[in-house]
Amino acid sequence: DSIPVLVLCTVNAKPDLGKGRGRLHEISDQRTAIAPLTAFSRTVMDANEMAQALADAFAAFETQRPRPVVLEYPLDVLAAPADIGHPKRERAARPQAKPADIDAAVKLIDGAERPLLIVGGGTVDCADQARAFLDKSGALAITTTAGKGVIPASHPANIGSSLLSKATQKYLAEADVVIAAGTEMAETDSWVDRLDIPGKLIRIDLDAFTLARDYPPAVGLLADAGRILAELTARIRGGRKPVTARAAEIR
């Protein structure tokens, strides 16, 4: 669910790692077992590296899709003295979408007749930007389960958190431009193997893997959803009236 969680845990002492000696709570490779659930997992093998490992974890929270980070400390490292000092923490910026890709997205949105906005969990911290884009673009909106509440249920252009609905899926197939912001469009939102999206798809996501997975976009914008939605809102022509009667019909 894109939640930043810092997990600090112990592992057997360095001489015992991977030896299968039957130590208490021994796992042959704890770091690898945890890795698929995390942004990264790391075994800190030197007490002097502890502070830098923590700094790297918080840098990941700031610049990537928020996900858990696991730092494991061998018992002998945890007990060792360390000259920590001040860790080096780079203030890396989040990814920035290419200007040419933003231009292409603006052109598609301005030329759309039936635009549709899908907002996911990656927009929960930029609800104002999502609503401003919706209002100016004249699109209808669908929220995923994780994005529920970003667009108020009372908003006349909000179809709702209803990708399970056949009526919603039908409208998704009718949309000529679909803007998917901060969403994986995962199976658990629709319970279909693959949604039918014949229109031009614009994806906005902070995670490069998610951006290209399952639904390759006509335009992929690798960036923070709030920043991109704000820029698109500033640049699109607007003036299109949302088909709120259709949204009410689908609801």
Give, region by region, the residue ranges found by the protein language model.
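N-terminal alpha/beta PP-like core and its mobile active-site loop of ThDP/TPP-dependent enzymes
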Residues: 1-245, 249
